[in-house]
Amino acid sequence: MTKPRILAAFAMTLIIPVAAMAAPQFFNIIDGSPLNFDDAMEEGRDTEAVKHFLETGENVYNEDPEILPEAEELYAGMCSGCHGHYAEGKIGPGLNDAYWTYPGNETDVGLFSTLYGGATGQMGPMWGSLTLDEMLRTMAWVRHLYTGDPKDASWLTDEQKAGFTPFQPKSSGEDQS
């Protein structure tokens, strides 16, 4: 083999795996049907965070201190009634530890799919109540409330895991973000 062919073959071994990485797939957590994002609100579809998430499955809002105050408000208004103020669980399951009623929720793609498409019981789909961007922000707040060992938090990057402190509620009146 000539040197140019060897270099070309080597280059292809680097290019093909990158090209083979497909965008994440989103399915209804209950029936397995593909989620239809045409149902989503128009507002909040084209943010950089949403575009990045739909291409990679990575929520750039996770542990972003700038969005946490708004994320807390979204969670308080849409989720805390069932899941508890600190995601400790009420009539809905707890969301702040390493146990997931739907194991797919351990990933951001899975949690997003549950938010978007709904789950069993009283957890209806959120596509008519939250924008796609608001869903990502709400997910970031849920992830922020995590009380477990950071090594088990698959949604965090290695860098985020190194600096992550498990959530502990502060005394009444203190900012939780």
From Swiss-Prot:
GO cellular component, one term: periplasmic space
SUPFAM superfamilies, per the entry: Cytochrome c (SSF46626)
Post-translational modification: Binds 1 heme c group covalently per subunit.
Chief site of localization: periplasm
Induction: During growth on methanol.
Keyword Transport carried by entry: yes
GO molecular function, one term: electron transfer activity
UniProt keyword terms in alphabetical order: Electron transport, Heme, Iron, Metal-binding, Methanol utilization, Periplasm, Signal, Transport
Binding site for heme c: C79, C82, H83
Signal peptide: 1-22
Location(s) in or outside the cell: Periplasm
Protein name: Cytochrome c-L
Organism of origin: Paracoccus denitrificans
Gene name of the record: moxG
